[in-house]
Structures are given as C-alpha cells and as structure tokens.
Design a protein with these regions (language model features):
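Polybasic (Lys/Arg-rich)
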Residues: 80-155
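Core beta-strand-centered patch of the WYL/Sm-like small regulatory domain
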Residues: 1-93, 98
C-alpha cells in the first residue's frame, strides 16, 4: 500500500503464477487492492496489461525508486464473488442448503449480498461470474450446492 500511495513501481519477487505455472519476478505498478485485500490490481510493465496478482502468491515486495510511468493505463476490471476476473461473463444461479450457504459466505463473503432465501433452509445465489471455474469447483466440492442455471452473457 506504500507503493500505491507514493505511486511507485514494485518488483513482486518470486510470484507463483497458476496461469503460467512459473515462479518469477514481476515488474509492476500497483494501483489498488480488491475489496478483501486478497489481490492487488497492477499494471504489468512487461505485458503492458492490467492484471490481478494474488497477494498470497507473492514471495516478497521490493518497492522501487521509479515512479509510475503508465498511470493513464491503470484500469480495474470486474472481479466476481469467487475472486476471478476476465473477459467472459456468465449469469449463474446456484441453490444452496444452509451448510453450503454458510460455507460460501465464510469462503467468499462478497457472495452474501447476491443471495436470497427462497424457502426455509434454501438459498439462491444469483450472480455474474468470469468463467465457470470458480462456481463449478464450489459445486463439485461442497455438498448442498447445485448450479441450476448458467447462461453466457455478451460482453
């Protein structure tokens, strides 16, 4: 957060990327955190793109003397309740029993605002997600959670 406030570049040392499967340093301009501080929005100076970096995958942070060079390109994207971002959008409805609902809210607190109780002990999550990986993983690993509808939304 020091680098954000001072508008300085940082080196994310030993960042472990699930996307590439590689652990390496990243030269970035951090400009904001997600709501839960699990991820940081950065402008990646190598790729010339805005990206989310998960804080738990960063070995350490080196704050550099260099100031931001690409501030006009800093743009936050959409992040779904499962903490995924990307260009794909799906409207998803998932039925949850009490146990699944509680687990979802504990793991993904932002999902709570998109849930409604439909009957005693039954909840419906109605949300937009960036791809289906997060919601399908939840359905496969948590008893009492079932996707009842998913539809791709045009961007």
């Amino acid at each position: 957060s020091e680098a954000i406030g001072e508008k300085r570049q940082v080196r994310l040392v030993d960042y472990a990327s699930s996307h590439s499967g590689v652990v390496r340093d990243r030269l970035v301009e951090p400009f904001d955190f997600t709501t839960d501080y699990n991820q940081v929005w950065c402008y990646d100076l190598e790729d010339g793109r805005n990206k989310l970096f998960k804080t738990m995958r960063i070995g350490r942070v080196e704050v550099l003397q260099e100031g931001w060079m690409a501030e006009m390109k800093h743009v936050k994207g959409f992040v779904d309740v499962f903490r995924f971002s990307g260009p794909e959008r799906y409207r998803v409805k998932m039925e949850l029993d009490v146990r699944a609902r509680n687990f979802m809210v504990e793991c993904f607190p932002l999902a709570e605002r998109e849930m409604t109780m439909v009957e005693d002990g039954k909840w419906l999550l109605d949300t937009v997600v960036c791809g289906l990986m997060g919601v399908q993983s939840f359905e496969l690993t948590v008893a009492g959670a079932k996707i009842v509808e998913s539809e791709r939304i045009n961007n």
